[in-house]
Amino acid sequence: MKLVKLIANLGYGSRKQVTLMFRDGRITDAAGEVLYADDAVPHDQVRVDGEPLDPPHGLLLMLHKPTGYTCSTKDPGRVVYDLLPPRYRLRDPVLSTVGRLDRDTSGLLLMTDDGALLHRITSPKAQLPKVYEAVLASDLRGDEAEVFGSGTLMLESEKTPLAPAGIEALGPRRARVTLVEGRYHQIRRMFA
């Protein structure tokens, strides 16, 4: 792949903008020598403004999502993509969140541009456990382990029961919940 296309695909700018970066001497090798658009240089030796290039396709990011942000790309409010360097929004292929966390939920969020990895992790067939820590408004009742683990718990307005879930009490109003599925506001609705 030509350097212009590679650098543009990593989100540093359009091909035209990247061509201008070459013209301005902003693209160099690891030794600081100015590169030209048709040079053949290994990815790890290319620098933009003295900084190494971002990783190519196959990027996997771990992000601590604070409350108040959504995992959508189209939300008019604050989105998790705003927490990343602006060029990450221009990557090709695009970065996608691995699952979602509600606006009012904080925690680890994975992001990737690897569609196959995304599918392997998020596919319901994978049954990969997802662990959440819930802070509750009232004390645990004490029967949550039995109810959540039964595989018969029905959420309001749902037609199928939830898959069995694990729960560990961390305090009177704190619990660690392990799910193998992810329904809309599932944990909030399980404790309702």
Give the label of every model feature segment.
Residues 1-192:
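Basic, flexible Lys/Arg- and Gly-enriched helix-loop patches that mediate nucleic-acid binding at interfaces
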